[in-house]
Amino acid sequence: LLDTATLSSAASLDLSSVSPDVISPGDLPGSVAFGINPRNASAPALPTTFSYDSTNFLGSFSGTIEHTGSVFFNADAVEVGNFTIGFDGNRAGTLGGAASGFFVESTTGIAAILFDIENPSNLVATDSSLTIDANLLVSPEFGQFLVDQALAATNLQGADVGDARVAAVPEPTGLALLALGGLAVLRRR
């Protein structure tokens, strides 16, 4: 659930539209979702390279989960999209200990890490599926961008602005992800 009211009041960002490849609505009312790019995606889409060992998920996570599609704000003047979900151990424990190390990066429009993913409230990693539910926290990079662009009066880093769900299905012969899952960004009201 993306807290559009908080983004509007705190950061002057008003959701205006989504690109045609975004699933709207997603599985839940008021949501948008992004399919996971396949491992064999070709340019300009980035291929998903993510893999893990279900017995040691956090210790074995490698690669990224890639998505195609954009979300637009302020009469389509501000674009974020073609999201990468990745892991950086140096981010773990930041934001007052809340950051898990996972992040959401926009690779089009505002090309920056937008959100740190909080330590998950739900994490189920098996050989046949992966589900992660967690809060989206404004990253230090996005917080500074909002201040620099005069969209926010103060740096909002660490502010909870929504919830993320990653639902993915590994290939039966390995742990590569298919385009059967997605990152859901939902409006929170």
Predicted segment positions?
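Intrinsic disorder/low-structure terminal segments
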Residues: G86, G101-F102, L114, E141-Q144
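C-terminal membrane-anchoring or membrane-association module
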Residues: V185-R189
